[in-house]
Amino acid sequence: MARKGSVSQRRVLWLQVFGLAAVQGAIALTWVIYNLYLEDLLVTLGFSAALATTLLVIENAMGAVMEPLMGSFSDQRQHWVGSRFPQIALGMILAAICFLGIPLVLLVGSSVKALLPITLVAWALAMTVFRSPALSLLGRYAFEADLPQAASVLTMVGGVTGAMAPLAGDFILGMGPLAAFIIGTVVLLSAAFVLRQVHPNQSVSAAASLETNAATPWANLPWILGTGAGVALGLRLLLGNFPAAVAKTGFGQPKLIMGALFLTVAISALPCGQLATRLGNRLTMLIGLAGLVVAAGLTSLMATPGIAILVAISIGIAFSLIGNGTLP
């Protein structure tokens, strides 16, 4: 008879993986909404548009420092309490409150304008409380050899959600900040509820759970943090410049090609997960990194819309190869 909290008959707990994918989708959606509205919110209250870049740098720096700390604290809670979910739930509730508070500051007006940057940073900080502990649950839901397949589901959800920025950005902006941020808040809280309903403390086996909690995070932490930070920064710079490079080819709708890029991430996620299962996660990530470097080099050489589409597809596949491995 299996021990409570462990399921030794299955190599991947797909129900729990899908619950975790709901959290990943909520994280991605809130960041899409945040990035779409950030500059407009700041300018509306009289701040410089350049402050948006400064805030993103601060938030990325906070994430690099806080996520490992929150992961370590979550490990301690797992050891002493037997569950990471209380920290995850608390973080998601705090993040939802801060996220909803962002447009409310705008409604109050310029008399409390100083609260806007504080609320923006507070939301980003609240996101670090639960993201690392939540995604670390993936190690409980699959044996090591099957982790790329499980991670590919999260990568697919992230790709579909990321495609909303270029393909549905105008629609989201048309809703207005209050409606958009309310939707993001509801989705975030709903994802927490879904994760709770799928019994997040389950694991493929007690032995695998103990091994993952005790050894794997610390052994892989430099690799995960270094690769994740480097890829995130490089991809942000690449995607920031890619629409302008597409426009130079004469194509009038760069957003469509950006949408194709993110949809490629989603479509290729599962096949890339299968490939990573066969080749090993680290080798697959290195192949993806090499492909991303080559695609980035080709960006400056794009002469026609057709080449731009091929480069976008290449970037999407490369990101799928990398994404499965950078998930904790």
Give short role names for the model-derived ranges.
Residues 98-105, 110-130, 307-322:
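Hydrophobic core of transmembrane alpha-helices in multi-pass small-molecule transporters
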Residues 128-142, 321-328:
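Intracellular juxtamembrane helix-capping segments at the cytosolic ends
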Residues 282-325:
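C-terminal transmembrane helical hairpin of 12-TM major facilitator-type secondary transporters
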Residues 84-101, 283-298:
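Structural signature of the two symmetry-related core transmembrane helices
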Residues 2-60, 220-227, 231-248:
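Helix-loop boundary and gating motifs at the non-cytosolic
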Residues 179-197:
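Symmetry-related core transmembrane helices of the 12-TM Major Facilitator Superfamily/SLC fold
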Residues 65-81, 173, 268-281:
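Helix-to-loop junctions at the C-terminal end of transmembrane segments
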Residues 63-64, 148-170:
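Glycine-rich segments within core transmembrane alpha-helices of 12-TM secondary carriers
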